[in-house]
Amino acid sequence: MEKYDVAIIGGGSAGLAALKQLSTLGKQAVLLEAGEKVGVKNISGGILYSKKPNNGRVYNVEDIYGQNFVNEAPLQRKITQYLLHATSKDKVFSMDLTAAHEYQSNFGYSVLMNELNAWFAQSADESAQKSGGGIVPGVHVNDISWDAEKERTTIQTDEIDEFQVKAVIAADGVNSEVAQITNARPKFSATQLYQGVKAVVKLPENVINDTFAIGTDSGAAHLFAGDITLNHLGGGFLYTNRDTLSVGAVYHFDSLLD
């Protein structure tokens, strides 16, 4: 039976960061991704931040993927404007929150996660293979069992032979199947969840620049609150990408059930 130091379940940004960091530390780690290709299930997009708090320690993306991350990764636009719009019928009150967002911050870039996660995966897989691990796509975990005497965990899947690890990282999202299989936590209730809906609108780069009064190397983030949510608890967002807009809304799940 194959043995590894760590099994990571889920090929999103969290799982890939874990694989990259563990491999850099010399651990033999394997990442199992249910999708046929890393990134195909990641349709989200937002703003990726790098922070520098005055107190405490934050491990940023460039700490894991290298200080040249900004120049190498498929980022969209550096966000240089942050605006909050409060709506009420035919009135809008706008506030500039740029200074607050830039406080103790290195940068914020708009991103499309299907593109960025593919880049994360290539970098993480290269590091993992050097340590005897790697990424295995198209694999669904169906059982996880713990042997206290051997201090080993056995991973069983639908597609490949079972194998053993010393530790498991559940990085398979908010509806984690690993958490359900292992009873690590109960299912979330509607009061604990938000539902997001996003559309990507294709526009010429120069139209985006002119419409939002930004340059080619800058971007804008617009947040919306008020009656735009039609009496539901939530808010809206609009982020400028290179030649698209990410537009959507996020609602408190239980407010959608009323």
Model-derived regions, located:
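N-terminal Rossmann-like FAD-binding beta1-loop-alpha1 element of flavoenzymes
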Residues: 2-30
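Conserved Rossmann-like nucleotide-cofactor binding loop
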Residues: 14, 37, 175
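Low-complexity, highly charged intrinsically disordered N-terminal segments
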Residues: 95-99, 195-197
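Short beta-strand to alpha-helix junction loop
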Residues: 102-122, 258
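Predominantly flavin-linked oxidoreductase catalytic cores and closely associated redox partners
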Residues: 123-258
